[in-house]
Amino acid sequence: PATTDYLATPTEVPNKGTVILIQKWNGLTRRIKETADAFAAVGYVALAADLYSGRIGLNRDENMALVQETMQAPDQIIRNLNAALATLKARPDVPGQVATTGWCYGGSIALSFALGDGNCDGTAIFYGRLLNDPEVLKQVQHEVYGTFAGLDRGPSVEQVSAFVTGLRTAGIDNDIHIYDNVQHGFWLHVDRDLDRNQAPAEHAWGRLLNYLDRMLSPLKTDSKDA
């Protein structure tokens, strides 16, 4: 990976698989790196991809400028992720199966990446721009995880419902959950309202680990090789 990416590897626990983390709109922040460390602590090789080459937005205008710059070349984003994926798969300590997860801007990119050529074995979305066209969504080749906020307006509950309908129509299994009475960003920023955010954030994390276990289980690799 590029030197600005952040790699966390398991030390005292078995290697369960690999997760690529895709940042929010403000860049590869300390919180995203902490999340990569949390994945490593439970047994995953975790690469937090830096799509801004070391830059971090400090306010809304800077964040928007960085997003617009990268979204002018969406194909380059996918190429960068594929390059990171290839580098990871070449490592001797990385199992063959890889999932992506992203937040907001990163959630949208994770979903787009899942529409590619099947390199990805799992996709976990925390909010983000969604799709609802079954003809597009049927390109996804695995179950999709999603965590959303009931008080969010982007995506709204109605948009999440349309996404779920699109997945079901396309025949894509999904583990989608809308948490009532929390705002956009509740999972990464639990401390903003601990009383309200902590319980749903912990529940979403448990669901995510169960999802990754289903998608990246070594038993799946063994069965393919049998």
Q: Which residues are covered by each model-predicted region?
A:
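Serine-hydrolase catalytic machinery in alpha/beta-hydrolase-like enzymes
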Residues: 1-93, 187-190
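C-terminal catalytic histidine-bearing segment of alpha/beta-hydrolase fold enzymes
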Residues: 168-226
